[in-house]
Amino acid sequence: MRTAIVGAGLQGNRRASALRLSDGDGLLLVADIDPEAAQRLAQEYGCRATRRWQDVIEAEEVEAVLICTPPHLHASIAVAALRRGKHVLCEKPLGRNPGEARRMIDAAQESGVTIKCGLNHRHHPAIRQAKLWCDEGQIGEIMFIRSRHGIAGREGYDREWRARGEISGGGELIDQGVHGLDLARWFLGEFSECFAFLSSSYWEMGPLEDNAFALLRTSGGQVASLHASWTEWRNLFSFEVFGREGYVKVEGLNGSYGTERAVLGRRSPSAPFRERVIEFRGEDRSWAEEWREFVEAVAEGREPLGSGRDGLMASRLTQALYESARTGRAVTPEDLA
């Protein structure tokens, strides 16, 4: 699929690499307000560069757009691309709020094209294995989920665009917490009640949180707890699902998060406790797998895994948790839709 990337920073480079791994020579154009950044990435992949994202929209040969900009630009770029009949994969969060995400979905539906939210964690092999075990009924009915995702930040983190709410839409909850919210919803379904505490423990970013603590409950009483942190000091990813007959755990994402592995534990009162462990070593191919599945979804005319609606629902949960933290009360996401 003939593709353009808007945003030549860390995520733009990561997405370009993933595109090459999964789609050959499909990158035609790179746009970034920093012309040197755009040119560097374009030279590496043998394509054209521009500093105007509007040039991407106007390029008739471009079939799909990868949006890798800060969140405040997501909606305007995506809506323009979708209205010109281009498919879009937009980095998370889909929008700074549900209204922006809704505009993108409406534009896609009106034009008959595909909008996808960048939720690459769904494509980590350990996550996929854990989901398979749950779907097979290996741990019985799910009772609760515990999700932890933490990074250390870096020098000057509080001076990056993430520290400006008008650009980012929020702090750690909307940045990394979105992944845990999306996975919890993928495993459990819709949540009817949300409660959150937010704190700024270390990074001086005004009203924005560097730690988010959340509890979410389904109408059936299943609970997900989530902690997303910019003060973990050593990168950590842990996603645990507990059922009536056992549990599954995902630990690590490779690289700085440690070896990625999926663990299945079965409850057996009459026998020695046993775990099955599968390790997934090597480079992180979740970005390439996400792009490959997106291309297949477009070709097959179906919703991709991590669809625009999934991005919208993650945005609604995020908004509900921010409202809960503000008011000190549990919030029903549907009331804010």
Q: What spans do the regions from the language model cover?
A:
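Contiguous beta-strand/loop segments that form the cofactor/metal-binding neighborhood of enzyme cores
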Residues: 182-256, 288-301, 337
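Beta-loop-alpha module in the N-terminal Rossmann-like domain of NAD(P)-dependent dehydrogenases
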Residues: 15, 45-107
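C-terminal helix-rich "cap/oligomerization" subdomain common to oxidoreductases
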Residues: 64-67, 295-337
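Active-site loop of classical SDR/Rossmann-like NAD(P)-dependent oxidoreductases
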Residues: 33, 279-292, 306
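Hydrophobic residues in well-ordered beta-strands that form the structural core
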Residues: 51, 67, 89-90, 115-117, ...
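N-terminal Rossmann-like dinucleotide-binding module
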Residues: 1-45
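Basic phosphate/pyrophosphate-binding loop/patch that engages nucleotide-derived ligands
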Residues: 106-114, 128-143, 243, 247
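Predominantly a Rossmann-like dinucleotide-binding segment in NAD(P)-dependent oxidoreductases
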Residues: 121-206, 328
